[in-house]
Amino acid sequence: MRYRRVVTVITFLAVVFVAAWGAYNMIIKHYFRNQTQNTVCYDFMKDKFINNVSAGNNYMNYGLWYDDTTTTLMEANNNLIDFVFNKSGLQHKQHMQVLDVGCGYGEQDLQWFKQMDASCTIHAIDISEAQIKHAIERIGHSNSNSNSNSNIVFEVCDVKDIRLKYNNRAFDVIFSIESAFHYPNRKQFFEHANDLLTPDGRFIITDIMLQNDYSENSWNNKLFVSFFSDFFHIPAQNLISADEWDKQLASAFVVEEVMDVTEKTFGPYYMHFMHTYIENKRLPRFIGDKLGSFFCNNQPFSYRIAICKKKNHE
């Protein structure tokens, strides 16, 4: 009798494991990882989660959280966008040409242009037709009362084609906000971006990579990386350490400044997100506490902001 019970339990656990593994491969690996565009995860996140935590939020970034002074996701998102803009040197300058690669829904471009001279132009590209359509519709809505955004050009474009698309144009500033870790060839993107800069141009990037002390021997780290790389469509070649990322960046640009802001991004983002989502769903608060702590304690990524200038390759 005891033997039969053991066999039954083992069989049940095996069935559960196979079912869970099958569901993971069907839902995560097939639906998210194998899409021709890496944007389905963001559309899903925005519709199912972000709108619950921060209604009307069109940003797709972790934000920059300043201790207790940042209390909402929208504030954190704006903090990050304002921070990189202030590093760009675009303030009070005329006729500046800006390229935003991986613009998503274009929220940052609308915010940046409010602080720019009307003679400037922002070219914003993304691989997602749906997200570009959304951005263009927002431009049209804004222009119903004013022409303040007429110099923002949203277009669908694959990152691998940017050098060909803009071969007769040079940019004073190129932004890459939380997008480069998705690209099949991030190193090539860096090289192409450098080619598109004016002689005094700047490249400003916020990006995600593995922590230097990441260990594949830790099962929870490995599980976290596996899930996130599948869900957010991160190619295996981009799962490199922060030090390796620094070298990759320096091979393409003159790097002026690199800031590790991991402590001001992932941790506070996960705690706020989990608490707010659980609270808005009217579930017990301890669930948000547990989920937030789990993500904070197990996430293996670093978050860096870099300010670069054009490198003249011989």
List where the protein language model places each region:
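A short acidic, Gly/Pro-enriched loop at the edge of an enzyme's catalytic core
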Residues: 163-174
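Class I SAM-dependent methyltransferase SAM/SAH-binding core
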Residues: 99, 105-143, 149-161
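Short alpha-helix
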Residues: 236-252
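A short glycine-rich, Lys/Arg-flanked "PGG" loop and its adjoining helix->strand segment in the class I
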Residues: 187-202
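Conserved catalytic loop of SAM-dependent methyltransferase domains
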Residues: 253-282
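N-terminal auxiliary segments of SAM/dcSAM-dependent transferases
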Residues: 4-51
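Conserved class I S-adenosyl-L-methionine
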Residues: 204-227
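Conserved alpha-helix/loop element of class I SAM-dependent methyltransferases that forms part
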Residues: 75-94
